[in-house]
Amino acid sequence: MKSSLLVLPLLISMSSAAAAGLSVRFDEGAPKDRFTLTNSGECNLKQARVMLDLSSSKAGLIFDVTASGAGVEVFQPLEFVKGADKLSRIPQVRDGDNRLELSIAQLKKGESIAFTIDVDDTLGGQEIIVSDSEISGANIQLSAGSNKLSGTFGANAVASIDGIECSN
């Protein structure tokens, strides 16, 4: 019986596959808002796509990247401040867009990609300032190989995805 109990934890650890994970954090800033994507999993993310979708956010959020268009007052174009070299291409964002897709070439365990951009709400509140709770309901989708998972931003302005099995 004792030897069976000693072997059980070993069998459990052998049977659980390593999983990829992603955490996305939104930080309101003036004049630039910031998104930080961190590989929170146990393996590298390779050839992955991340879709940041603000269309279902509580405040109807949009990207404000030009002086004229859908945004309000201050605008800020998309600017990568960390990890741009982890992308296979830099995405294009138009004023008023509510989606942004990132094509990740490789993001190692613990590494981050961060970018700044202006985010405005469209529901007539304080449009140039987005509170943490206003991004709640927005989604992220992670596609890697045949796996596709999604996560939703909570009132804490964080969305997380876990559970994509690591590939070799």
Task: Describe each model-derived feature in a short phrase.
Residues 4-14:
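Sec-dependent N-terminal signal peptides
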Residues 17-28, 44:
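Low-complexity, acidic Ser/Thr/Pro/Gly-rich terminal tails and inter-domain linkers that flank the onset
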Residues 43-116:
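Structured domain cores in non-transmembrane regions
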